[in-house]
Curated annotation (Swiss-Prot):
Alphabetical list of Pfam families matching this protein: UDPGT (PF00201)
Protein name per UniProt: UDP-glycosyltransferase 74F2
Induction: By auxin, abscisic acid, salicylic acid and the bacterial pathogen P.syringae.
Enzyme class: transferase
GO biological process, one term: positive regulation of seed germination
Positions annotated to bind UDP-alpha-D-glucose: 273, 325-327, 342-350, 364-367
Tissue-by-tissue expression: Expressed in seedlings.
General remark: Plants overexpressing UGT74F2 show increased susceptibility to the bacterial pathogen P.syringae and reduced accumulation of free SA upon infection.
The protein's role, per its UniProt record: Glycosyltransferase that glucosylates benzoic acid and derivatives. Substrate preference is benzoic acid > salicylic acid (SA) > 3-hydroxybenzoic acid > 4-hydroxybenzoic acid. Catalyzes the formation of both SA 2-O-beta-D-glucoside (SAG) and SA glucose ester (SGE). Has high affinity for the tryptophan precursor anthranilate. Catalyzes the formation of anthranilate glucose ester. Is the major source of this activity in the plant.
MF (Gene Ontology): benzoic acid glucosyltransferase activity; nicotinate-O-glucosyltransferase activity; salicylic acid glucosyltransferase (ester-forming) activity; salicylic acid glucosyltransferase (glucoside-forming) activity; UDP-glucose:4-aminobenzoate acylglucosyltransferase activity; UDP-glucosyltransferase activity
Entry GO CC: cytosol
Keywords: Glycosyltransferase, Transferase
Species this protein is from: Arabidopsis thaliana
Length: 449
C-alpha cells in the first residue's frame, strides 16, 4: 500500500532560477500525498547547507565538479558532457538505493536542460517528465527552431505579433552564446518520449501558447511555483523560498524600511542572480532611479560598476542599495509601486502574481520575449526603449518608463491588469483550478506506476 504513494525524484539544473521552482513543485506534490526527493549537485548542497529535517528529502548527485561547480569547468560544453556522465551514474545509484525501501522511486522529474535523465528513468521503467522552467510561449518558439534545424522564419504564423527584437536573444543577436542556444534546443531531443511535459506557468496566462504546444506534446502547466502563503494558502507550511544560494543574514532591515514608505511609492530594482550590466548601463540606470524613491539590489560582483561616489550620495531615508533582498516579501509590500526587472521568468511570474506592474529591461535569452508579453499581451508594464546601435537604455527612457508605470495615463490600466493576473493565478491553484487539476493528473500517473 505504501508503494502506491509514489515517489518523485526531482532533478533541477543547478542554478537558483531552476532549483527554486523545482523545490516549490516538490512542496505541491508532497501536499498531494507523494513522497519527493530533490537532487542537488554536491557543490550546490555544500553551498546551501540545507535543512534536512523537512518533509522533502534531499539527495546529492554529481555534475563532475563537486568542489567548484560550473565555474570550474573549462566550457559549458565540457560541463554538460561531464554532468551527463556523472549525473547519469549518481542518479542511477539513488534509484537503486531506494529499490528495496518502502518507497521506491517511481518517477523522475528532470530539468529540460538535462534531457539525458529520461534515458536513466526508462532504464529503470520509471515515469519520466521534463520540467521547463521558462514559459510556454518561449518554449514553443524554441521548439519551432528545433524542428527547423536551429532557424526561425518570421513572421511566426501562430504568433504573428512577434518581431525580431521580441524573440529570445539567440535569434535577435545571431551567433550569440552558441553553447547556450544549443542547450535550449536540445531540450526537445527526446521530449516526445516523456509521459508529460511540465511547464512553470498557468493555463489562463498562456492559453493560446499552451494550446499550440499541446499539439506537439502532453503539456501540463503546474505554476505559478510561488509559496502557497502568498496565493491559495492551502499549504500552511509553505511560507517562502528556503533554498537560497544568495542570501542576507538579516531580512528585517529591508522590510522594516519599506514599512515606513508611502504606499506605491518605491521603485524596486533587481536584475536576478545572473544578469550582468555594462558600466555604461549601470551609470544610466543609477542616474534614472536617483529621481525616485528606490530599493535597488546590486550583487557584490556588480557593485564596482556603480558610478564613483553613487553609494555615498544615496539618501538612506528615501532609498536603499542592498546586495540581496527577500524578493517575495519585497514585492508583497504595499510600498512597492513598480518592479524594474530584467524579465527573468521567475521574477516576471512573481510580479504578475503579486500584482506589481513592471518596467522591463530584458538582457538576454528568454527575457526579450517575456518583456514583449509583459507590455503587449498581458499589458502589465512597459519595455524601456534602447539605443539601436549600442543597445543601451538611456536614463531619460528609463525615467520616462518608470513614470509611465507609476503615474502615467496607462498606470491604472496596468495595475488593473496585474490584479487580474494575480486573481487568475490564485484561482488556478485553488481546488479544481487549472494548475491544481494538472497536478492531480500528474500525481495519478505517478501513483499508478
Amino acid at each position: 500500500m505504501e508503494h502506491k504513494r509514489g515517489h518523485v525524484l526531482a532533478v533541477p539544473y543547478p542554478t537558483q532560477g531552476h532549483i527554486t521552482p523545482f523545490r516549490q513543485f516538490c512542496k505541491r506534490l508532497h501536499f498531494k500525498g507523494l513522497k519527493t526527493t530533490l537532487a542537488l549537485t554536491t557543490f550546490v548542497f555544500n553551498s546551501i547547507n540545507p535543512d534536512l529535517s523537512g518533509p522533502i528529502s534531499i539527495a546529492t548527485i554529481s555534475d563532475g565538479y563537486d568542489h567548484g561547480g560550473f565555474e570550474t569547468a573549462d566550457s559549458i560544453d565540457d560541463y554538460l558532457k561531464d554532468f551527463k556522465t556523472s549525473g547519469s551514474k549518481t542518479i542511477a545509484d539513488i534509484i537503486q538505493k531506494h529499490q528495496t525501501s518502502d518507497n521506491p522511486i517511481t518517477c523522475i522529474v528532470y530539468d529540460a536542460f538535462l534531457p539525458w535523465a529520461l534515458d536513466v528513468a526508462r532504464e529503470f521503467g520509471l515515469v519520466a517528465t521534463p520540467f521547463f522552467t521558462q514559459p510556454c510561449a518561449v518554449n514553443y518558439v524554441y521548439y519551432l527552431s528545433y524542428i527547423n534545424n536551429g532557424s526561425l522564419q518570421l513572421p511566426i504564423e501562430e504568433l504573428p505579433f512577434l518581431e525580431l527584437q521580441d524573440l529570445p536573444s539567440f535569434f535577435s543577436v545571431s551567433g550569440s552564446y552558441p553553447a547556450y542556444f544549443e542547450m535550449v534546443l536540445q531540450q526537445f531531443i527526446n521530449f516526445e518520449k516523456a509521459d508529460f511535459v511540465l511547464v512553470n506557468s498557468f493555463q489562463e496566462l498562456e492559453l493560446h501558447e499552451n494550446e499550440l504546444w499541446s499539439k506537439a506534446c502532453p503539456v501540463l502547466t503546474i505554476g505559478p511555483t510561488i509559496p502557497s502563503i502568498y496565493l491559495d494558502q492551502r499549504i500552511k507550511s509553505d511560507t517562502g523560498y528556503d533554498l537560497n544560494l544568495f542570501e542576507s543574514k538579516d531580512d528585517s532591515f529591508c522590510i522594516n524600511w519599506l514599512d515606513t514608505r508611502p504606499q506605491g511609492s518605491v521603485v524596486y530594482v533587481a536584475f536576478g542572480s545572473m544578469a550582468q550590466l555594462t558600466n555604461v548601463q549601470m551609470e544610466e540606470l543609477a542616474s534614472a532611479v536617483s529621481n525616485f524613491s528606490f530599493l535597488w539590489v546590486v550583487r557584490s560582483s556588480e557593485e564596482e560598476k556603480l558610478p564613483s561616489g553613487f553609494l555615498e550620495t544615496v539618501n538612506k531615508e528615501k532609498s536603499l542599495v542592498l546586495k540581496w533582498s527577500p524578493q517575495l516579501q519585497v514585492l508583497s509590500n504595499k510600498a512597492i509601486g513598480c518592479f524594474l526587472t530584467h524579465c527573468g521568468w521567475n521574477s516576471t511570474m512573481e510580479a504578475l502574481t503579486f500584482g506589481v506592474p513592471m518596467v522591463a529591461m530584458p538582457q538576454w535569452t528568454d527575457q526579450p520575449m517575456n518583456a514583449k508579453y509583459i507590455q503587449d499581451v498581458w499589458k502589465a508594464g512597459v519595455r524601456v526603449k534602447t539605443e539601436k546601435e549600442s543597445g543601451i537604455a538611456k536614463r531619460e527612457e528609463i525615467e520616462f518608463s518608470i513614470k509611465e508605470v507609476m503615474e502615467g495615463e496607462r498606470s491604472k490600466e496596468m495595475k488593473k491588469n496585474v490584479k487580474k493576473w494575480r486573481d487568475l493565478a490564485v484561482k488556478s491553484l485553488n481546488e479544481g483550478g487549472s494548475t491544481d487539476t494538472n497536478i492531480d493528473t500528474f500525481v495519478s500517473r505517478v501513483q499508478s506506476k
